[in-house]
């Protein structure tokens, strides 16, 4: 790696590191979407919900002056449970009939693949610096790109799941919005995908600049 490319690689890896932290935060948290139910005029409280890839949390909160349910950050009685298809011993009847089981399992499984690609990419990147083997940055970059693509697919599956749930005739939820976990996953996708492509370009051998040069004239990699 040439001295001019080393700073670019370090900056790119720092951006990828931020993407890794955001991706892990999104996968383990349960604020991908926030749901609000239909409100009756005589109600004084409402039960809002937020959920992620693995579990749903409901919170009973007092209605505001505008008769709206929320925001979800208001104090109230909170109850969290894992989705029944992940933990049969848990009870989540309030959500079980309105969610799409296949969508939920698919989004969670794809996110696990993303974390696996992140681990393999990080191992390659560490070996590239510790063993002075710059060529390992190329597979590392591809692993990061694959991780970003998996996150994108997981985001789209989750978005379709929420949309189908809201459109269902059996659901009690009529309003929703995506929360900070979803935003973390979106930011992680951008950082990992663009960072992986940039890292791949920076780690490629120098191309010939003149017609009489060849790739064999480039500086050897260590």
Curated annotation (Swiss-Prot):
On modification after translation, the UniProt record reads:
N-glycosylated.
Against InterPro entries, the record matches this protein to:
PMP22/EMP/MP20/Claudin, VDCC_g1su, VDCC_gsu
Where on the tree of life does the source sit, at the highest rank?
A: Eukaryota
Q: Where are the transmembrane segments?
A: 11-29, 109-129, 135-155, 180-204
Q: Which GO terms describe its biological process?
A: calcium ion transmembrane transport; positive regulation of muscle contraction; regulation of calcium ion transmembrane transport via high voltage-gated calcium channel
Q: Which residues are glycosylated?
A: 43, 79
Bilayer topology reads: Multi-pass membrane protein
Q: Which Gene3D superfamilies match?
A: 1.20.140.150
- What keywords are assigned to this protein? Calcium, Calcium channel, Calcium transport, Cell membrane, Disulfide bond, Glycoprotein, Ion channel, Ion transport, Membrane, Transmembrane, Transmembrane helix, Transport, Voltage-gated channel
Main location as per UniProt: membrane
Q: Name one GO cellular component term.
A: plasma membrane
| Cytoplasmic side stretches | 1-10, 130-134, 205-222
Could you list which ranges are Extracellular topological domains?
30-108, 156-179
Location in the cell reads: Cell membrane, Sarcolemma
Which residues are connected by disulfide bridges in this protein?
57-80
Q: Which GO terms describe its molecular function?
A: calcium channel regulator activity; voltage-gated calcium channel activity
Tissue and organ expression note: Skeletal muscle (at protein level).
UniProt family annotation: Belongs to the PMP-22/EMP/MP20 family. CACNG subfamily.
Q: How does it assemble?
A: Component of a calcium channel complex consisting of a pore-forming alpha subunit (CACNA1S) and the ancillary subunits CACNB1 or CACNB2, CACNG1 and CACNA2D1. The channel complex contains alpha, beta, gamma and delta subunits in a 1:1:1:1 ratio, i.e. it contains either CACNB1 or CACNB2.
Q: What does this protein do?
A: Regulatory subunit of the voltage-gated calcium channel that gives rise to L-type calcium currents in skeletal muscle. Regulates channel inactivation kinetics.
Spell out the protein name for this chain. Voltage-dependent calcium channel gamma-1 subunit
